[in-house]
Amino acid sequence: MFSSAHSGLLEKLFHYIDLHQDEFVQTLKEWVAIESDSVQPVPRLRQKLFQMMALAADKLRNLGAGVESIDLGSQQMPDGQSLPIPPILLAELGSDPEKPTVCFYGHLDVQPAQKDDGWLTDPYTLTEVDGKLYGRGATDNKGPVLAWINAVSTFRALQQDLPVNIKFILEGMEEAGSIALEELVMREKDHFFSSVDYIVISDNLWLSQRKPALTYGTRGNCYFTVEVKCRDQDFHSGTFGGILNEPMADLVALLGSLVDSSGHILIPGIYDQMAPITEGEKTMYKNIDMDLEEYQNINQVEKFLFDTKEELLMHLWRYPSLSIHGIEGAFDEPGTKTVIPGRVLGKFSIRLVPTMSPSVVEKQVTQHLEAVFSKRNSFNKMAVSMVLGLHPWTANVNDTQYLAAQRTIKTVFGVNPDMIRDGSTIPIAKIFQAITQKSVMMLPLGAVDDGEHSQNEKINRWNYIQGSKLFAAFFLELSKQHSGHQMPSSVY
């Protein structure tokens, strides 16, 4: 896989990373200590976000990168306050036309976290317990961003020429919807991204605790609300119960018409757009190393709907799913309040798979709910709205950087990676692919039990350090495998 010269350099790179792993962990501790929460619209936290982006910019400049901090202006909040948006960092290290250029995307903002949410440690004090580094942002996404930086800094420390040109795009609002990112990518398409050959994202997890993975697809997401309204005020059930169409009863019937107890979506035509299953895809599922019992235990689930690995993965990745999320306007507090809500709003979403279109799904959902509501002969008013429509994403697993990543994983970890999709929605992958027309790859570092977004988020020291080695080796292998520009395309 690697020439003798490259093998010798790899040994030096890996040895340096091992020797300096405590320094790398200390840097992660410093980054985790910054409460860069983008979700809560609080001036103090916005200041923390600016502090985080400035720290990252300094880190990149110390590597010798040219860094541009893009001012994004301010954000008007529903309560009338105006909050500054943290800048997006565009950084560049090397511009040799003989080398491929790889751009790394990451985010430095985090979800909210407090000790009394159920954390065993202070979420903003990186704490190591049995090789696990606990802290908010450790795996999502500060750890992977630093692992990439660690790889670059190792070449620098050993006075070795980087085999690829490196670019960074780092944002601070991913957890709040990546405000202004798509517009920036569009604006920079013919500038910052013009020389980019490959884009790497490391913002998801492996399927297991020990076996690495490469991700080649994510599901899209259509988020809906359905409102049923009689009037703005609530009713007393003793005064009005039995003499009107209750909005809650209508809404429960509507939500109950969407999906059955086996997870099958009941909306007519919803499966018609789905890409057919290929033999190559079936083989991929068979080759994935997954223990169903372990997966159930890790996720604290007594039993899933499906008994085989292949069925479970297909329903998680390549079949659409429908989830009901909640009801606004309903009484949900302790006690025995006998109110009839005058207006209720149901919320549900459908995860899309290739080659489903949000606009088609919106039409199908609306027609289905209107038909169900019509049969109830209710005097209430119903309104359906799709508030979010995000496309699914797939990559070409046979393009240069995927082949390079597979070989690199074999070198660093000694095993071939699981080729996986992600059942969630990561819009940035589709945004990069659609706008830049470059090869986009998701190369995760974290284990399945890292707990991103939840209490006790962590990244294993082993994943963090081996991930730093992985990225360093990837630079060498990508340089070797690079054979000109390849347009990303659907894997199926």
From Swiss-Prot:
Catalytic reaction list: Preferential hydrolysis of the beta-Ala-|-His dipeptide (carnosine), and also anserine, Xaa-|-His dipeptides and other dipeptides including homocarnosine; carnosine + H2O = beta-alanine + L-histidine; anserine + H2O = N(pros)-methyl-L-histidine + beta-alanine; L-alanyl-L-histidine + H2O = L-histidine + L-alanine
Keyword Iron: no
GO annotations of cellular component type: cytosol; extracellular region
Binding residues annotated for Zn(2+) 2, in chain numbering: 107, 140, 203
Active-site residues annotated for this sequence: 109, 174
Cofactor note: Binds 2 Zn(2+) ions per subunit.
EC code: 3.4.13.20
Major localization listed first in the record, in broad terms: secreted
Assigned keywords, A-Z: Carboxypeptidase, Hydrolase, Metal-binding, Metalloprotease, Phosphoprotein, Protease, Secreted, Zinc
Binding site for Zn(2+) 1: 140, 175, 453
Domain of life: Eukaryota
Keyword Protease included in the entry's annotation: yes
Localization, UniProt: Secreted
Cofactor: Zn(2+)
Tissue specificity note: Detected exclusively in kidney.
Residues carrying Phosphoserine: 194
An example molecular function term from Gene Ontology annotations: metallodipeptidase activity
GO biological process, one term: regulation of protein metabolic process
Family: Belongs to the peptidase M20A family.
Function, in words: Catalyzes the peptide bond hydrolysis in Xaa-His dipeptides, displaying the highest activity toward carnosine (beta-alanyl-L-histidine) and anserine (beta-alanyl-3-methyl-histidine).
Official protein name in the record: Beta-Ala-His dipeptidase
Organism: Mus musculus (Mouse)
